[in-house]
Regions:
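Rossmann-fold NAD(P)-binding glycine/threonine-rich loop
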Residues: 47-77
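C-terminal catalytic/substrate-binding lobe primarily of soluble NAD(P)-dependent oxidoreductases
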Residues: 99-210
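Short gly/pro/ser/thr-enriched loop/turn and capping motifs at secondary-structure boundaries
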Residues: 50-58, 86-88, 112-118
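N-terminal Rossmann-like NAD(P) cofactor-binding module of classical short-chain dehydrogenase/reductase
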Residues: 15-24, 44-46
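Adenosine-phosphate binding glycine-rich loop
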Residues: 68-114
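Conserved Rossmann-fold cofactor-binding substructure of NAD(P)-dependent oxidoreductases
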Residues: 2-20, 29
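Short beta->alpha connector loops at strand-helix junctions that form conserved
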Residues: 3, 47-49, 83
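Helix C-cap/helix->beta junction micro-motif
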Residues: 39-40, 75
Length: 210
C-alpha cells in the first residue's frame, strides 16, 4: 500500500479498521497522522513529540497534550506520545525508579550509543531531524525552571563496567527534561533539576559541524 504522509486522507484510507496507528514518520507529519487516527477511530502512538504544532517546540509538546489529549479522550481513544527508547523507555525507567525514593532532587538521563556501523551511517534515525536536534540549544530543568543551554557543553565523564573506555557526555536537545518538568511533584517526587546528556557516534559526527 502506497501512502502519502503529506495527505491526511491518504493515511486515513490506509488505516481503516486498524486498532492502533503507530507514527514513525519525521515530526512534521504528526498532525496528519493524529488527525487520521481520530478520523478512523484508532488509538495512536508515536516515538517523540512533534515540532509541527507551534513555532517553539515546548509549545508544540503542550499542544499535543492540551489540545489533542481531550480530542482522543472524547473519542474514547488512547494517544501515547514520545514512546521510543529515548524518550519513552528511559522515561518509564525513571518513573519506575521513583517508587524507591522519598524525594528526588536531580535526574541525569545519560544516553550513550556505543554501536558504530561498518559503513558511513552517522545517525540511526532521520538525518534531517538528527541534524536539527544536534544544532539547537538543549533543554535543562534547573532549580525548577526550564532553560536553554549550548549543545556539546556541560560535559561529564563516566566509565561504567560495560564500557571499554571513559565516555564524555554533553548537552543535547531532547524531550526528557521537558516531559519531567510538566508534573515534577506528581510523578517525580518534586525533582528540581533534570538534564539529558548524550554521547556516541552521532555526537562525535555532529559536533564538528556545529
Amino acid at each position: 500500500v502506497l501512502v502519502d504522509a503529506r495527505n491526511k486522507d491518504s493515511i486515513a484510507s490506509a488505516a481503516r479498521d486498524v486498532f492502533l496507528l503507530v507514527n514513525a514518520l519525521p515530526l512534521s507529519f504528526t498532525p496528519n497522522v493524529m488527525d487520521a487516527a481520530l478520523e478512523v477511530g484508532a488509538h495512536y502512538q508515536d516515538y517523540a513529540a512533534s515540532t509541527a504544532f507551534a513555532k517553539e517546540w515546548v509549545d508544540s509538546i503542550h499542544y499535543q497534550f492540551d489540545v489533542y489529549g481531550p480530542k482522543f479522550e472524547k473519542a474514547g481513544l488512547l494517544a501515547l506520545i514520545g514512546t521510543g527508547s529515548a524518550p519513552g523507555l528511559i522515561c518509564a525507567a525513571t518513573r519506575d525508579a521513583m517508587r524507591y525514593l522519598d524525594t528526588c532532587e536531580s535526574i541525569r538521563n545519560l544516553v550513550w550509543e556505543g554501536i558504530e556501523a561498518k559503513r558511513f551511517q552517522p545517525f540511526w534515525w532521520s538525518p534531517e531531524v538528527a541534524l536539527e536536534d544536534m544544532s539547537e540549544l538543549s533543554y535543562a530543568y534547573i532549580d525548577g525552571k526550564l532553560i536553554r543551554r549550548e549543545p556539546y557543553t556541560h560535559e561529564i565523564k563516566r566509565h561504567y563496567d560495560s564500557m571499554s573506555r571513559e565516555i564524555t557526555f554533553a548537552e543535547h536537545s531532547h524531550d526528557e527534561p521537558v516531559y519531567y518538568s510538566l508534573h515534577p511533584e506528581e510523578y517525580f517526587k518534586g525533582v528540581k533539576n533534570v538534564v539529558f546528556k548524550y554521547a556516541g557516534a552521532g555526537m562525535d559526527f555532529a559536533k564538528p559541524l556545529y
